[in-house]
């Protein structure tokens, strides 16, 4: 229908925008406290940038008609664009780079036969140019602090789960499976589909391995104990030890409102550029689990845009603003209305128009008030009072051209803009 937004998109009305800005401002405050600086990249990018050397499928990009030889598309995520900007526009900058973003991303409207939201809003950080366990722990703590700033970890929201995997370790553990079955095994493990694992045409030893990999999720000590039942290669042992160091470092430095770290070695991201830890924040609701944020380490992505980057590492995460908004709204943590207007300025007649405009500007600039100018021709006091009550305006200011403004209070039932 011509008067409706496209499938998978929606209008954000003033109340929606107020709630979205409430979330974004708190996330931004935490990002800045950790030393991250905002970056804004183009909504429209070259397709070669967006597919990240093949790590992002072209089918995941909404492509647009263009005279560009490589084609153009709408970004399905921010990491590739920021990596491209880092190795071109920020080349030579002092490392590490700490960047954050507040932006929209775009996905195809249909995933298989299922309609999904086409335009999404995200907030996130990227830490570029440094690897290691300490950098991983920093990013996890930035995420934990951001959630705490929104009220997670305290009533009425309660706890959340930080689930961490290791992409390189998981890929390596899947290598013994036949190539034609490896992806099926991976998908079954990721979807907790034990029945499929038991039905795949695998030798008994490989079936036992698949079932063990299926169970590599939960408390870290339990996962590490199960992992030791496998004969690990030197690389796998190194990755296992590095993951154990991260768990110890994160838990030792976690605050009282932070969620204990859980492990899930079946956790893989839909974008295939991750090379180290991958993680997501899961929050349980009466309707099921919601993923509020996700991210991971990508130590070869920057090489795609500059071969001279020589393995420059990176790690980051993105928060799903829509999911956060739904969870916070259900917990009564968000503003229910846009901010109320403080004063309504009414010219008593046409000769007072100039004086009314001047008074409105004085209140805005000098007193830092939210001011609305009354534009209706019906200026009867009872009509103006009713108008102010409907719009939750606290005071009325009558302005005439030859005398001082006269102010009176309005009986407004509720002017609170948030329950927080």
Swiss-Prot record:
Keywords: Amino-acid biosynthesis, Cytoplasm, Histidine biosynthesis. CDD domains: HisRS-like_core. GO terms for biological process: histidyl-tRNA aminoacylation; L-histidine biosynthetic process. It holds the Pfam family tRNA-synt_His. Heteromultimer composed of HisG and HisZ subunits. HAMAP family: HisZ. This function is generally fulfilled by the C-terminal part of HisG, which is missing in some bacteria such as this one. Required for the first step of histidine biosynthesis. May allow the feedback regulation of ATP phosphoribosyltransferase activity by histidine. This is ATP phosphoribosyltransferase regulatory subunit. The gene is hisZ.
